Amino acid sequence: MQNIPPQVQAMLGQLEGYQQQLQLVIQQKQKVQLELTEAKKALEEIEKVEEGTVIYKTVGTLIVKTDKAKALEELKEKVETLEVRLNALERQEKKLNEKLKELTQKIQTALRPTAG
């Protein structure tokens, strides 16, 4: 590490920061994907239910009664929100991957002359 120029050390620090950000984005993306899958399954099931069937939903630690129309509306809204969030996370992941690739190339280029 002592033979590495300060500017390369700074780039390595930046690279590590990008890697940590990417890890967080990937974790968030997985969580949103899971929530989206669950919401879509719930929506599918509620659409099969006849009108007038009693439906319950969880609100925090409570379970409350609701009707089909309201449950459908809320789930469709949730699916839409999660899809928007997922798209944003995918864009963020793509940008971070591009930054990582670019920075890795810069580091390799900077270290190449001293490697001989």
From Swiss-Prot:
The keyword Acetylation does not apply. Gene3D superfamilies: 1.10.287.370. Belongs to the prefoldin subunit beta family. The keyword Lipid metabolism does not apply. GO terms for molecular function: protein folding chaperone; unfolded protein binding. Heterohexamer of two alpha and four beta subunits. One of its GO terms (cellular component) is prefoldin complex. Molecular chaperone capable of stabilizing a range of proteins. Seems to fulfill an ATP-independent, HSP70-like function in archaeal de novo protein folding. InterPro entries: PFD_beta-like, PfdB, Prefoldin. It is found in: Cytoplasm. It comes from Thermococcus onnurineus (strain NA1). Its main location: cytoplasm. This is Prefoldin subunit beta. Keywords: Chaperone, Cytoplasm. It comes from the Archaea.
